[in-house]
Amino acid sequence: MSTNKIPSLELSMYEAFIEDIIGKTFKILPIWEDCAAEKEDFESFNSYLDKLITMLIGSNYIQKEEKIYSVLVMLKGLQQREDLTQRKVKSIVFHCIDLLKKVN
């Protein structure tokens, strides 16, 4: 883990934040599946990704971490793709989770 944290940010708070982000990242898959099953326009999926991406941008401002930047890039790419399948979404979600676990 990088050492350029804001001094007031305690390690345990940061670890809890990363665990929360892991849970939120996992939630991407069922949200996408619900949209695909209902043949929606994926507005709720994109809205959820927007919020998660915003949180990660903020966290990367506080704690410069290469793995968080990688997750940001992957989630933004996920948001931009139109050829998604359940298999692709699952693969990207679990790759992001693996990266986040390495932060903690």
What are these regions (language model features)?
Residues 5-16, 36, 58-62, 66, ...:
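Short, solvent-exposed segments of well-ordered alpha helices
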Residues 2, 8, 12, 44-47, ...:
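Generic serine detector
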Residues 69-104:
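Amphipathic alpha-helical binding modules
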Residues 23-70:
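Amphipathic alpha-helical interaction modules
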Residues 17, 41-44, 67, 88-92:
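Residue-level detector of well-ordered alpha-helical segments, enriched
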Residues 1-40, 93-102:
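Short terminal alpha-helical segments
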